[in-house]
Amino acid sequence: MTNLTLMNQLTPKQIVEKLDQYIIGQTGAKKSVAVALRNRYRRQLMDESIRDEIIPKNILMIGPTGVGKTEIARRIAKIVRAPFSKVEATKFTEVGYVGRDVESMVRDLVEVSVRLVKEEKMQLVRVKAEKNAEKRLIKLLAPSQKKKQTTSQNPLEALFGGMNQPDESAEEEVDQELKNKRSQIEWRLQNGELDDEIVTVEVKEQQNPMLDMMRGAGMDQMNGMQDALSGMFPAKKKKRKVTVREAKKILFEDEASKLIDADELAAEGIHRAEQMGMIFIDEIDKIASKEGGGNAQVSREGVQRDILPIVEGSQISTKYGTVNTEYILFIAAGAFHMSKPSDLIPELQGRFPIRIELDKLTQEDFYKILTEPDNALIKQYKALLKTEGIDLIFTKEAVERIAEIAFQVNQDSDNIGARRLHTILEKLLEDLLFEAPEINMESIKVTENYVNEKLAPIMQNKDLTQFIL
């Protein structure tokens, strides 16, 4: 099912309901993102004459850390299988300085988009690819006795992976005895009897040695040259010993890739990134200019001016082709403790017309976060200990006390939102997680007294609270 079909089936109200399964509160932010997503679907149904005039309304989320800014964007992208990329504004530097090139955010998005399209296309060719992979695997488990013709390699060919590789698909002479043997192996293979056997397969190396030498830390400008060189020289292959179970996956991916048109994959990946892509720019408040900032202010403003043309709409070169960023949805987020949105350059402010202020989390929100979402933290810890045969039970009073402590610690020290629950639960269950394999108990109940016993000493010492919780 394509992401356009998914959006067709989901109204803004339904999108918010799906987000409610994972994120507590923040209704305003959920509504704004849901409407932005639905507008993209509406745009696809319009005539071309007006469609090109409608661009996404970018969103600026304002709120402290840990209240759900990133999670809202990430979850909504998963719901509709839209290409999604998260970047941190502080990682970028002005052109001419060492650091990530701002255009890399678009390249990252295209990589995600192509991967999503490839996954969908691999499902379409799954049956044929699995059949071809099985044939190759049977030949590896029961090889022909006929010796393969060896080919000489000069040193350069050896370095770049070899130009003259034997053709695995070449016809081979198979006698009746070998046919019978392969028939038996096929039956055992399909029944999973050989999954733990070891077989040698050829796999492509991830990087060419020469490209590894040329790669520099943070040098995104080298991507184009690396991609060009990787296309000139074939990927070097190496032999690996793996289980039959793993070999099935390796050979399936190889066979599926052969059945997928690379040009069509690149074109569709670029189209989806352009029309459905979402880029989340976190910590944008950290590059906001402030009064009297000196050289640091100039540098931050330079990054903003580098980001501006991408948000406005420009042509970015990637290894798959040129990408137009005009219709990509940008969601920027920041706490804005030390600065305010008006500290951003006016041109960039104007490109984020929808502004949402997210609410700080209350004690009641913490309780709901612990219990209601499908991926609630308490459910995660219960599942972890279930693997040890222990049924972990939390009383209502215990959960309320955990929520109260999390809220109080956030009030007394830095407010890190829902992330505080991770540190508190980890400290609370530390001994239990350590001793679980040796505990001969079917169930353990976490009560309010247990919570107080484990956390009260730390709560009473403000210095310990600051460093431990």
UniProtKB/Swiss-Prot annotation:
Residues binding ATP, per UniProt: I24, G66, V67, G68, K69, T70, E71, D282, E347, R419
Cell location: Cytoplasm
InterPro entries to which the protein is assigned, alphabetical: AAA+_ATPase (IPR003593), ATP-dep_Clp_protease_ClpX (IPR050052), ATPase_AAA_core (IPR003959), Clp_ATPase_C (IPR019489), HslU (IPR004491), P-loop_NTPase (IPR027417)
Keyword terms of this UniProt record: ATP-binding, Chaperone, Cytoplasm, Nucleotide-binding, Stress response
Coiled-coil region(s): none
Subunit structure as annotated in this protein's UniProt entry: A double ring-shaped homohexamer of HslV is capped on each side by a ring-shaped HslU homohexamer. The assembly of the HslU/HslV complex is dependent on binding of ATP.
Stated name of the protein: ATP-dependent protease ATPase subunit HslU
Organism of this sequence: Listeria monocytogenes serotype 4a (strain HCC23)
Gene: hslU
